[in-house]
Amino acid sequence: MAIGYPNGKKYAASQEELPQQKRKAPVTYGKRGMSLEDDLNDTIAYYLTHEIAVIHKKPTPVQIVSVDYPKRSSAKIKEAYFKTPSTTDYNGVYKGKYVDFEAKETQNTTSFPLSNFHDHQMTHMANVLKQDGIVFVIIAFQKLGETHFIPFEKFYPFWERMQSGGRKSVTIAEIQDVSDQIPYGLNPRLDFLQSIDKLYF
């Protein structure tokens, strides 16, 4: 319905009086608000609460260099550095077996760069494997929405190939050939124990 003035002119609202249309942000399906580490931490908390497995994330070692004591009851760290971690991110026990694994994520869609791993991590995982532990790598391709469970014995040949002058990355096709894809769920978020049951028990 048009509104008019008594003199016959039509009413036109100013820009300030018009309701502002809200601009909707474009919908993105990448990341979905959680990182691989968050997903794994939620998953292992679920396992612990339901007495399924005891797995913990190891804290990142920090070297404290300088501390200030402004009060007797408090301390303020003024300078600290990350130490190079000597082992993997996660370890624990499941069905009486020692479990040890490293988790990495990438934004790449075609390959995973092996530079994300370090020599000392590979040495540690190889040593755990020699002691008959369950050792594996979880790699998440965030943009693809895929998370892969790779037994260490199938992942290590890619590392050896790089060490002998070969490719410095693993293609997504190579990973899909040797891995078990972990489906996303509600609880637990990333049920990697399904992969352990399938491959080791």
From Swiss-Prot:
Record organism: Listeria monocytogenes serotype 4a (strain HCC23)
GO cellular component: cytoplasm
Annotated region described as Disordered, given as residue ranges: 1-26
Name recorded for this polypeptide: Holliday junction resolvase RecU
Keywords, sorted A to Z: Cytoplasm, DNA damage, DNA recombination, DNA repair, Endonuclease, Hydrolase, Magnesium, Metal-binding, Nuclease
Family: Belongs to the RecU family.
Lineage: Bacteria, Bacillati, Bacillota, Bacilli, Bacillales
Classification via Gene3D superfamilies: 3.40.1350.10
Cofactor: Mg(2+)
